[in-house]
Amino acid sequence: MGKKGQGTEGNKPRKKSKALSYFVRFLAAVMGLVIGFCLYWVYIFGGTFVSVPVVNQEDYSTMDLSEGGSTTGGDVTSSWSNGGHTRLYYDPSHPIIEVKQKDSNIENILVFGIDARGTDDYACRTDCMMILSINKKDNSLKIISLMRDTAVYIGDTEDTLGTRLNKLNSAYHYGGVGEMINTINVIFDLDIQRFVMFDFGSAAEIIDLCGGIEIDVRPEEVSYLNEDLEESRALDGNNSPNITSGGVQVLDGHQAVAWSRIRHLDSDFARASRQRTVATALMTKVNDMSYGQKLQLLNDSAGVFETNMNSADIMRVALNCFACLDNREEYRFPEDGTYTVQNDPWMMLIDFDEQKQRINDYIWGE
């Protein structure tokens, strides 16, 4: 009896060891999947990442800016018609100035499109500028259009602001992505550090990858949409057809971009509203996709846009945005009645202190 008891006791450790072995193998398999997914994610978005230095004001004040110069995210020789994209314009003399995040629950990211006329036209002006303000605390998303004709003083810091008013959309032309972000932060007292950049072709390509987006086109917009579409065909050789009538319809990428760029019909304010509508429709379309479709979209869109966010940042921001889609607001600055107009050249003149207070109250609350 004693031997039998000893034998039974002796088998227990082997059973535990076997169970532990299964658990270790299961854990290893899960870790392998996680690591594999992370490597896949990094592989996909490695081509979108552009390293743009972020420096504090003390380091900026001691920089040697005599060399100047400019650079892009990479090769600019591939034409739009051959699938090329206009690369990010970055001037080493204008790094992004480090700004402390005001609220750890609220992140502000600049999404902008450039008015380039070819892949070598990288030192161009911005066509649209939108701030995605993501509030993790209350799961809300605010999409804020900054009017491109707003008159501002351009510069990296309060001490280096220019003395002559320029349109906000020219900041990118004069000093690349760094000076554009710095100007917005200084003028409006914001804390933007991250950005996403598109050109006409890349925005259209992403919309096409999603199967187009549903837009309610007003009858009076049809001819203007087709005019912009004709211009885009001349620039990049796309074969997107004209639309024939107004109403709710699915627009392909080039049609949607052409619709969002209509300006001569009404105003720049209506134009900014159309751009926000396209952005929201695209985010909603992606959010409604299955997990497999989202992975395929990520794979297909690699290299279509450029950003200074790494793969982990992109994943975090995307998840936060999707979580906030049902609680979103759209707005533009400056607001109606808070600016005057200068006709030659046409610019929107603002009270800087008033607008600074308004946009801060809107993002962070009064």
Question: What are the residue ranges of the model-derived segments?
Answer:
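Non-catalytic, solvent-exposed segments at the cell envelope interface
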Residues: 2-10, 14-29, 37-366
